[in-house]
Amino acid sequence: ALNEADGSNKSAISKYIETTYGELPDETVLGSHLNKMKESGELAFKQNNYMKADPNAPPKRGRGRPPKPKVPLPPGTVVSPPRPRGRPPKDPNAPPKSPKAKATPATGRPRGRPKKVARSPAVPSPTAVSTGRPRGRPPKVKPQLTEVSVES
């Protein structure tokens, strides 16, 4: 199917697979496999046709920025192995750590919000105002009506 000069489309490839190998599982499976082969460079895609990629063509560049070229080390340099990943394991033979003593704060105050101090009931709060005025906003003063006589 792919040996034609101008390539083969998806339907021709599926017909070829059905005649050669029998039943196809699904059209989408074939499409996804063709896309994978196209992305990896095994197949070339041109005008809705898939064709075998040229074996002499240079490999496709990967996505993103290429890595920096490594500078060769001078001869005689010993390269240490890279550090292992993750947290190092605990030493089972190490003595147990002593518990830390709690450090008292420098100010001498306890942490958090202070406790509510209860007031002694000996000093009653004044309930009535000594001036005799009622609480709140004073009422609006209404002007007094005067009788006006109309003489004719």
Swiss-Prot record:
Keywords per UniProt: DNA-binding, Nucleus, Repeat
One Gene Ontology CC term in the entry: nucleosome
Single biological process term from Gene Ontology: chromosome condensation
One annotated GO molecular function: methyltransferase activity
Domain H15: 1-54
Region (Disordered): 40-152
Residue ranges flagged as DNA-binding region: 60-68, 82-90, 108-116, 132-140
SMART domains reported for this sequence: AT_hook (SM00384), H15 (SM00526)
UniProt subcellular location: Nucleus
Family statement drawn from the similarity comment of this UniProt entry: Belongs to the HMGA family.
Protein name: HMG-Y-related protein B
